[in-house]
Amino acid sequence: MNTDLELCLKHLQALVSFDTSNPPKKIQSSGLLDYLNSLSYLNPQVTDLGDGSFNILLIKGDPKYIFNVHLDTVPPGEGWNTDPHTLDITDEKAIGLGACDIKGAAACLLTLIELGLDDYAVLFSTDEEAGQSTCIKEFIKTKPNFKGVIVSEPTNNLGVTCHRGIYTGTQEFYGIAGHSSDQRAMEDNAIHKLTNWCHHALNAARSFDNEAIGPLKGLAFNLGLIAGGIKPNIIADCASIKFGFRPLPGQNIDSILNSLQTQSNLNESSFTPGFIAPALPANGDLKLSELMLQDLNLQPSEPVNFWTEASLFSEAGLPAIVFGPGDISNAHQPNEYVELIQLSQALNIYRDIVK
């Protein structure tokens, strides 16, 4: 093991030890901010945005690109063979909560800064996993002036220029309560209205099956949570469903919503949007991000299904790609790990990008 990787693992060991699970997002008391402030070669600019959302900007010189790494993680869950917050290093892997998603990238960047860089810009954020993105949205408001943004997520050290967007919402249906022996239950039951809508929505989602970008095909649509009703002999007066879909770059959201028939109708139904974020690239034009990939000399990835905050930068007019060590299939599960060889590769690639 070379000295650069040893230093990287030292930083990763520290980062994993801080419980930055989101929820509960207790960043202030986790030790993370104290650790970054204790590093003499850093001068972190910390912005407290409230509710556990912190932007931590590291900047020096005149960098062309800015790196973004989220330092919050999902909760550990059950099934770990070791302490999730104690980095377990084997001959091939570094195992620990956030090692793959995506504290490994942060450790790489801290290593390179410690070894000496003249020009760099790194934004650590802490609220990606909750689907808030307050950190990125607020940072964008400062009108950052960079040639592009490299958002860190586990991509096997390949450059991602294209991924799906995300849209969630709640459709609520209203009925007229009464005894279920009444024939009107067929029409007045809110659950009946909901199931009819679900049938329509599934068919509408399938109508997009022939649309594709690379290996990404159709509209990823999911009925996620249903609630409503009281008991079998009462006509349900209210029922709701939470659903989501993942559009391809260039797909029109309003057109999709119209196809799903999410309109609110007086005394019948109401629709409430949830978390909404664009695809990457936000305008559907891959040209700028592909040019950025060439400029950075990164190996390209196929388009991916998962969403990242790169799309928010893209929406704001900043070319953005997704890049980082680790495989997404190893994230969000017990015994999360990143391969040591990928950390070594990422160190070299990040070094080349900065220089």
List each language-model region with its residue ranges:
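Short beta-strand segments
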Residues: 68-70, 123-125, 150-153, 172-174, ...
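Active-site metal-coordination/substrate-binding segment of hydrolases
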Residues: 66-121
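Short glycine/proline-enriched coil/turn segments at helix->beta-strand junctions
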Residues: 38-43, 59-65, 113-121, 143-146, ...
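Metal-dependent amide/peptide-bond hydrolase catalytic core
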Residues: 48, 154, 161, 167-355
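N-terminal helical capping/dimerization or prosegment-like subdomains
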Residues: 1-77, 238-244, 256-259, 340-342, ...
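Phosphate-handling active-site elements
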Residues: 90-92, 112-123, 145, 201-210, ...
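Acidic/histidine-rich catalytic neighborhood of metal-dependent amide-processing enzymes
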Residues: 98, 102-168
